[in-house]
A protein has these predicted regions:
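Active-site-proximal beta-strand elements of phosphoester/diester hydrolases
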Residues: 5-17, 121-130, 144-148, 194-197
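Core catalytic region of metal-dependent phosphoesterases/phosphodiesterases
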Residues: 6, 13, 17-118, 172-176
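Hydrophobic/aromatic beta-strand patches that form the interior of the parallel beta-sheet core
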Residues: 8, 48, 83, 114, ...
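Conserved protein kinase catalytic core
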Residues: 15-18, 58, 93, 133, ...
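Binuclear metal-dependent hydrolase catalytic cores centered on His/Asp/Glu-rich metal-binding motifs
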Residues: 117-171
Length: 209
């Protein structure tokens, strides 16, 4: 049985941005409602969120937590399966995944937190890569890969390119089919890797990206 029939994805919504602004969180909620409407119209039964649901790593505001619960419940009711990838902003530490800010949504029906590599059939769903995990990627042959990757030579914004600091590279995915990633907010494609871009512009740096 296929891992999914038709999937809808979004990424980098950053609930809690702008000092846990209610205006921003309302914008996020409006996007989720719109996204569900579009996904239903296209017949998507599965949702994959590609990381950075929250903005603040070290603390989650109570108001923002309430937005998270209500919108995760909304997604869980709309899809048969919702996979929520842990991005770097969802993790307390940048270099390990032992603590994340999303555990309290784990028991919402149809919600699946992806805090460890999930490989099934021809699909891989990968959280923020830590330590030397990237070395496993070259051996992968999955048709579809979803993750929150920090790949060199992609644009971090319209002006600044991610430098090559060693480690994970775009060419490591050469054995895979299509790769879809969150993290960089500018929508862009290089080889078989697509950065989807954030859900909507969060500031002037994101405008028209």
């Amino acid at each position: 049985m296929a891992f999914f029939k038709k999937v809808a994805c979004f990424t980098d919504i950053h609930f809690g941005l702008k000092g846990n602004s209610r205006v921003h969180n309302d914008d996020c909620e409006a996007f989720v409602i719109w996204f569900i409407e579009q996904a239903r119209a296209e017949g998507c039964e599965t949702c994959i969120f590609l990381g950075d649901w929250h903005h603040h790593r070290s603390a989650t505001n109570v108001s923002t937590m309430n937005y998270t619960v209500s919108n995760m419940e909304r997604l869980g009711a709309a899809f048969e399966k919702v996979y929520v990838i842990m991005g770097n902003h969802d993790l307390y530490y940048r270099d390990k995944r032992e603590i994340n800010s999303m555990e309290y949504i784990r028991n919402i029906p149809n919600i699946h937190i992806v805090n460890e590599w999930l490989v099934a059939d021809d699909v891989a769903i990968i959280p923020w890569v830590v330590e030397d995990e990237w070395k496993k990627i070259e051996k992968m042959k999955q048709k579809y890969v979803f993750g929150h990757f920090e790949l060199p030579y992609f644009k971090m914004n319209a002006m600044v390119e991610m430098p090559d600091v060693g480690g994970i590279q775009t060419d490591h995915f050469a054995g895979c089919g299509k790769v879809f990633s969150g993290h960089f907010h500018k929508r862009q494609i290089m080889k078989n890797v697509t950065y989807m871009g954030n859900a909507f512009p969060h500031n002037y740096a994101d405008a028209w990206d």
